[in-house]
């Protein structure tokens, strides 16, 4: 009998899918249109357009920007669109919504670039532990992308997994 210790995890055919690898490390900022409202309620078009024209949008260079309004004011859609036209040339990504919407869009962008063919008929472990906060959206989107391809999908670490999906025979 051999006393050799065999690492069966290392020699298994599992592919680890680590969502942390798809985390965009860039700065995230919120542009709150509330700062452009009169009495936190009214967007005055003339003043807003003048502000948009004169403001130094370069401060958003390379940043990920969520455009939102933190008050219950009714903001015309064109106002958000106008802001986006000025921020887009400088920012990495611009979305409408809060920081959660921004995080979701960043993960979506990264996941859309993955060559999924590598997961065809493979046993995949979606890594559960991470040094960065990975939104639940990213895990659900990963299942949507991998389920049609993978032989099986598990969650956790290769040494301790929770079965999520197994392709029917």
List each language-model region with its residue ranges.
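Short glycine-rich or small-residue beta-strand-to-loop segments that form or flank ligand, phosphate
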Residues: 64-70, 95-97, 123-129
